Curated annotation (Swiss-Prot):
This is Anhydro-N-acetylmuramic acid kinase. Transmembrane segments: none annotated. Disruption phenotype: Cells lacking this gene accumulate anhMurNAc and are fosfomycin sensitive, in contrast to wild-type P.putida, which is resistant to fosfomycin. Disulfide bonds: none annotated. Pathway: Amino-sugar metabolism; 1,6-anhydro-N-acetylmuramate degradation; Cell wall biogenesis; peptidoglycan recycling. Belongs to the anhydro-N-acetylmuramic acid kinase family. It comes from Pseudomonas putida (strain ATCC 47054 / DSM 6125 / CFBP 8728 / NCIMB 11950 / KT2440). One of its GO terms (biological process) is response to antibiotic. GO terms for molecular function: ATP binding; kinase activity; phosphotransferase activity, alcohol group as acceptor. Its EC number is 2.7.1.170. The gene is anmK. PANTHER family: ANHYDRO-N-ACETYLMURAMIC ACID KINASE. Catalyzes the specific phosphorylation of 1,6-anhydro-N-acetylmuramic acid (anhMurNAc) with the simultaneous cleavage of the 1,6-anhydro ring, generating MurNAc-6-P. Is required for the utilization of anhMurNAc either imported from the medium or derived from its own cell wall murein, and thus plays a role in cell wall recycling. Contributes to intrinsic fosfomycin resistance in P.putida. InterPro entries: Anhydro_N_Ac-Mur_kinase (IPR005338), ATPase_NBD (IPR043129).
Length: 363
């Protein structure tokens, strides 16, 4: 038995998820902690997702702040649990993705794991994606192997859907290797559009989207992006799907009500997921949803409408809190690294072979 911490900061940049887990024969979630992202740090990280001046210094300063925030959250969680740093074997830190371009041979996550190890007194495992990219893979998604470990006993033909900033599927079938890929935008465009139009960080329960009407012309234009035509392995990020991308499409179409654009973006998220699933897996028994999208009632309802033959439910219905699956995954990835266990899946990322992921920063 060993304790691990997983730290996850996704493309939504809303905050840091920290999970304390116990790794034995099975993985058990013991405690969680959430720290909101300071608005100025969020803006700095968002700015680093596209080209700009003085990027190296800006990235270095931002990752120091990210590590300091993560360190503070870890100290708070350990204090609440009455644990000393030496009780934890390692921290699995995803860091913050600022660029992801595997076709050009690189992916960049920042978070200064050396500083995080120094601040916490706990060994840190980080930089999980680059080894897979070095082996010719997409570097994403990395969670399908964890989903397989966590959920494979629940059925013969399952799909695990993570909806964060982007959506990705893990396809689990008995006696077959796990498959997985990114489907497209999850919450990233929904969040960006409502933030620009109303100043809200996200569309609570999808209520604003539900007040609008999806526009077929806009949806067709968005779905014509080449990314959606490809089959997995594939991954994507803010480099492709962002507000300028949406604005370019809107500029060529009639003016729409803002809520109708939001409704169309929700339909884009739902359709890209179900279309991707239909291409890759037939006879899906259940679609289990985790990530922020599991809390979006309008999205969950639409997924159920588009996939009537399967059970569509939050992972919470199966005893796994949907908000903490990814943080748990990076705790598990740290365990795999320290034990020398390969944690990528070539059937997911198209890497040349199995690889041990992560770099170790001793306490």
């Amino acid at each position: 038995m060993a304790l691990y911490l997983g730290v996850m900061s996704g493309t939504s940049l809303d905050g840091l998820d920290i999970a304390l887990v116990e790794q034995g024969e099975q993985l058990e979630l013991l405690a969680t902690h959430y720290l909101p992202m300071p608005p100025d740090l969020r803006q700095d990280l968002l700015a680093l997702c596209s080209s700009g001046p003085d990027e190296i210094a800006r990235a270095a300063l931002a990752e120091n702040r990210w590590a300091s925030l993560a360190g503070e959250g870890i100290r708070q969680l350990l204090a609440r649990q009455g644990l000393k740093p030496e009780a934890v074997r390692a921290i699995g830190s995803h860091g913050q993705t600022i660029r992801h371009e595997p076709a050009r041979g690189f992916t960049v996550q920042i978070g200064n794991p050396a500083l995080l190890a120094e601040l916490t007194g706990i060994s840190v495992v980080a930089d999980f994606r680059r080894r897979d990219v070095a082996a010719g893979g997409q570097g994403a998604p990395l969670v399908p192997a964890f989903h397989e470990t966590l959920f494979s006993q629940l059925g013969r033909r399952l799909a695990i859907l993570n909806v964060g900033g982007f959506s990705n599927l893990s396809l689990i079938e008995q006696d077959k290797p796990v498959h997985g890929f990114d489907c497209g935008p999850g919450n990233v465009l929904l969040d960006a559009w409502i933030e620009r139009e109303h100043g809200h960080p996200y569309d609570a329960d999808g209520a604003w989207a539900a007040s609008g009407v999806a526009q077929p012309g806009l949806l067709s234009a968005l779905m014509a992006d080449p990314f959606f035509a490809g089959s997995g392995p594939k991954s994507t990020g803010r480099e492709v799907f962002n507000l300028p991308w949406l604005d370019r499409h809107l500029a060529n179409l009639p003016a729409y009500r803002a809520q109708d654009v939001q409704a169309t973006l929700l339909e884009l998220t739902a359709r890209s997921i179900i279309d991707s699933l239909g291409k890759a897996q037939q006879g899906t028994e259940a679609l289990l949803v985790c990530g922020g999208g599991a809390r979006n009632g309008a999205l969950m309802a639409r997924l159920g409408q588009l996939l009537p033959a399967a059970r569509v439910a939050s992972t919470g219905a199966y005893g796994v809190d949907p908000d903490w699956v990814e943080a748990m995954a990076f705790a598990w990835l740290a365990h795999c690294c320290l034990e020398g266990i390969a944690a990528n899946r070539p059937s997911v990322t198209a890497a040349k072979g199995l690889r041990v992921l992560g770099a170790i920063y001793p306490a």
